């Protein structure tokens, strides 16, 4: 039986995969994330590094998934994760009332034969022209810290968003649909079938 390995320390990604009913183990990658001028290159190289770090420690029959997400705007270029309130405030002020892109790179590798697939998903997001008071309140929650682009769309950051074009879950950090299709087509892992099977078995046991 194939074992899914998530090469991530992101609680958002871990929680989202668990909500789908997927069985997987987590190997937090100890890498230095790199940022280049090109957002596509940034996320793919970081996803590659995460997956290959976990590959060393993953059990046999593993399929390892590495992912990386960044924000890109024409004013700021590639935006990573702010580590200070000042940095988060600066980023959100420049994103306010404007469109930006969320890029997620995914790198999947099978340990037994080193077969791999990679892809990039882009989602377009427009922020509201929120007030300075709203910005201050949001910053005070500390939610923006260590979040790509300085906001968490699955949290209070949703209140800052006006429009999304593309995969919502890509903004959270996992392009769910494309990941599901890729795992099923190239690696023989059917997340939907497995999730349904677990639910049916669970209901049978409670009867």
Swiss-Prot record:
Q: Which InterPro entries match?
A: ITPase-like_fam (IPR029001), Maf-like (IPR003697)
Q: What cofactors does this protein use?
A: a divalent metal cation
Look at the named UniProt entry and state the broad enzyme category this protein falls under: hydrolase
Q: Does the keyword Hydrolase apply?
A: yes
Which residue windows are coiled coil?
A: none
What does the record give as the active site? 68 (proton acceptor)
* SUPFAM superfamilies associated with the record: ITPase-like
Instruction: Tell me the compartments it is located in.
Output: Cytoplasm
Site-annotated residues for Important for substrate specificity: 12, 69, 154
Please write the reaction equations for the catalytic activity of this protein: dTTP + H2O = dTMP + diphosphate + H(+); UTP + H2O = UMP + diphosphate + H(+)
Say which domain of life the source belongs to. Answer: Archaea
For the keyword Cytoplasm, the answer is yes
Which keywords annotate this record?
Answer: Cytoplasm, Hydrolase, Nucleotide metabolism
In the record, what terms sit under GO molecular function? dTTP diphosphatase activity; UTP diphosphatase activity
Q: What is its main location?
A: cytoplasm
Task: Please give the function described in this protein's UniProt entry.
Answer: Nucleoside triphosphate pyrophosphatase that hydrolyzes dTTP and UTP. May have a dual role in cell division arrest and in preventing the incorporation of modified nucleotides into cellular nucleic acids.
What HAMAP family would the database entry show?
Answer: Maf (MF_00528)
The protein's name: dTTP/UTP pyrophosphatase
Organism per entry: Staphylothermus marinus (strain ATCC 43588 / DSM 3639 / JCM 9404 / F1)
């Amino acid at each position: 039986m194939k074992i899914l390995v998530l090469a991530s320390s992101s609680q958002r990604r871990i929680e989202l995969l668990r909500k789908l009913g997927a069985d997987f183990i987590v190997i937090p990658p100890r890498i230095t994330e790199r940022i280049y001028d090109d957002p596509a290159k940034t996320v793919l190289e970081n996803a590659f590094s995460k997956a290959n770090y976990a590959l060393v420690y993953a059990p046999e029959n593993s399929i390892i998934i590495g992912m990386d997400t960044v924000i890109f705007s024409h004013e700021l270029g590639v935006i990573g994760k702010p580590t200070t309130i000042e940095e988060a405030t600066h980023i959100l002020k420049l994103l306010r009332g404007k469109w930006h892109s969320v890029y997620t790179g995914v790198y999947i590798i099978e340990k037994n034969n080193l077969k791999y697939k990679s892809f990039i998903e882009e989602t377009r997001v427009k922020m509201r022209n929120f007030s300075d008071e709203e910005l201050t309140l949001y910053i005070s929650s500390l939610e923006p810290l260590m979040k790509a682009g300085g906001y968490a769309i699955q949290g209070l950051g949703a209140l800052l968003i006006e429009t999304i074009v593309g995969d919502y879950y890509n903004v959270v950090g996992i392009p769910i649909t494309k990941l599901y299709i890729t795992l099923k087509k190239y690696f023989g892992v059917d997340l939907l079938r497995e999730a349904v099977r677990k639910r049916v078995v669970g209901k049978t046991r409670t009867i």
